[in-house]
Amino acid sequence: MDLATIAFAFSLVLLSGLSTSIGGALAVGKREPGPKFMAAALGLSAGVMLYVSFMEILPEALKKLESTLGDEARATWTMMGAFFAGIAIITIIDRLVPEEINPHEPATTEEEARRKRLIKTGMFTAFALAIHNFPEGFATFLSGLEAPEIAIPVAVAIAIHNIPEGIAVAVPLRSATGSRKKAFWWATLSGLAEPLGALIGFALLMPFIGPMTFGISFAVIAGIMVFISLDELLPTAEETGEHHCAIYGLIAGMAVMAVSLALFI
């Protein structure tokens, strides 16, 4: 594995992680993206993730496991176990991080209470997203090492998915502090967990990297991506109230992914 491949994979992770800063910039700007745009963008991201997971990443995982285990049945069971393990990992992370946080210290006025609540919400959201983005960073990095034709659309999908996360961090902080700069930088920092996850994951798994490691990791990655699509992206798209835009985006994401894979392969 040469340095250029490692640098390419890490660059993809860094760019997709830093897209939270786009969300931060939108949140501190004068205009926020409209509901139709957000629904379509989130649907597009979900479509890309779902299509590439089932049509490319899982078959690739099975191929690598078969080459190592030498038995299709064992490879299939191993792939299925790793896929649902990926779902379990991201589910546990999702369950451990509460959706809301209440202030622990009493405030002197209602406005002060609101301000403290918003500050804590924004900072806690940044922390929660950092934990949540950790496995996504490693997933993108590993894809970049082994299969660039998969890694590029995956990185784009994760980047789109990170934009509303940046907005979620920046909006309460901007409202509470009045500082656009602080809101923007907190949103940016929340995305840096992805390159950190890539570095730590690579350091831990580098001695074990081979067909078996890639096969299991790809199946785990597919599980993580499917969960994110079904639990986060599509529900968030639906919350905009633009159901059809979300579905059109979903179909468009699948179509774009199908065409891009056909052109690359």
Curated annotation (Swiss-Prot):
Binding site for Fe(2+): N133, E136, N162, E165, E194
Segments traversing the membrane: 6-26, 37-57, 77-97, 122-142, 150-170, 184-204, 208-228, 245-265
Chemical reaction(s) catalysed: Zn(2+)(in) = Zn(2+)(out)
Keywords on record: Cell membrane, Ion transport, Iron, Membrane, Metal-binding, Transmembrane, Transmembrane helix, Transport, Zinc, Zinc transport
Database matches in Pfam families: Zip (PF02535)
Subcellular location: Cell membrane
Entry superkingdom: Bacteria
Keyword Ribosomal protein set for record: no
Protein residues bound to Zn(2+): E136, H161, E165
GO (cellular component) term, any one: plasma membrane
A GO molecular-function descriptor: metal ion binding
Bilayer disposition of the protein: Multi-pass membrane protein
Record function comment: Mediates zinc uptake. May also transport other divalent cations.
NCBIfam families from the UniProt entry: PRK04201.1
Family to which the UniProt record says this protein belongs: Belongs to the ZIP transporter (TC 2.A.5) family. ZupT subfamily.
Protein name: Zinc transporter ZupT
Annotated source species: Corynebacterium aurimucosum (strain ATCC 700975 / DSM 44827 / CIP 107346 / CN-1) (Corynebacterium nigricans)
